[in-house]
Amino acid sequence: MTRGPSATGAVSGETPPPAHSDDASGADITRLVTQFLSVRKHFAARAARHDRTGIFAPETVRELADAGFLRVPVRLQAGGYGASLSVAQNIVGLLAQSDPVAALLLVNHYMVHASIAARDNWPEPLARRLEEQAVSRPGLINALLAEPDLGSASQGGSPGTVATATGDGWRLNGRKAYVTGIPGLSELVVRARTDEPEPRVGLFVVSAGADGVTTVPNWDHIGMRASASHEVILRDVIVPYEDTTTLFHGDAKAASGSVLMHWNCGLLGALYDGVVRSALAWTIDFLRTRIPSNLGKPLATLPFMQDAAGRVSLTLATNNLLLRAYASDVLTGNAVTISSDAAVIKTEVVDKAADLTMQLLAIAGNAGLSARNTLERCHRDALCGRIHAPHAELVRRRAGQTVLLTPPL
């Protein structure tokens, strides 16, 4: 795999990702990102406005679709860019430096389409139809995995959303939690179980505008405020039999597919790395321009400020190495290391993003907490990294079980 610049670009967000040898459309990807760089300030300004109001920005979805960003993971032969996880990380990380909510929308969209592109439990006719839609009339898609009662699927357990066989297809009933971007979604990929004597679990594709789909507008978190990650109620929603992935007995985790979960981890890492890069960029500018009257020179000249900024910068360099190694393993299908690398990315990149923004707040002082400035919003958004599944306690416990309970060779 060709190595290039940082997985999320420079701290300033000014370096577009290079073409990669595993992407036949590398030049097209570079043009796409260069186009975004010319309007990134527009995205950043809108993100700040909608963070204050907490209102979803549908124009963001339209602009991403019109520019071609929704086709990034779609196969080349289907009219997409055929991008690898590495390139998708570049795009998500770069976008996160301007608009973390828009980046989160792409995380969910990309992980589903990567799974479709790999035909990971997806029957060919359904996969082909969704790819054609992504190119001819692009719209956002998201996987509805979490539930208010069950919580995250990563903890195990059968979903409470039930699919009942009828003469017209499956009839879905249930409630899903944290459906990011629901006002802007075109398709919902719903994790559900059948009501058969021996239940099967799989993903059911539902149009977001289908009869029986209702949104409960209850998202009120302090971070990712404009993501509209509301709950969704499904009441007697009809799904044609051909609009489901492979249905699995017993092992419900297999129903989501490994590709979807692998991309989810790698892209979330890029997103929260991008949030920290944005926070550091603001802090650097502040320290360079802030000259206290009793000091007579910029705060950036103080050794302890340099130490603090350097600590965050070095951690971001480590993030880059981790994200690149993980994307390489996913590309080559290195199953031995993917699982352990995913645990490291969740705990060290995603979960610790808020630790890094807190360190920056500590040196920025009152200015860092002002709603007029970027840093406090970056910190609130970074806190959301910890709520993504799997949660840190589960990751650490699994790691502990591996080292303590696995017999030595």
Could you say what each language-model-derived stretch is?
Residues 58-66, 71-175, 180:
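Glycine-rich flavin
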Residues 177-182, 265-268, 385-388:
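Glycine-rich phosphate/pyrophosphate-binding beta-alpha loops
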Residues 221-315:
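Glycine-rich beta->alpha junctions and the first turn(s) of the following alpha-helix
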Residues 178-215:
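A short core secondary-structure module
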Residues 3, 366-409:
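Glycine-rich phosphate/cofactor-binding loops in nucleotide/flavin-utilizing enzymes
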Residues 1-107:
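Amphipathic, small/basic residue-rich leader segments at the start of a protein or domain
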Residues 35-38, 275, 282, 311, ...:
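Charged, amphipathic alpha-helical oligomerization/scaffolding segments
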Residues 44, 48-52, 317-348, 361-369:
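C-terminal helix-coil-helix/basic helical segment that borders enzyme active sites and/or dimer interfaces
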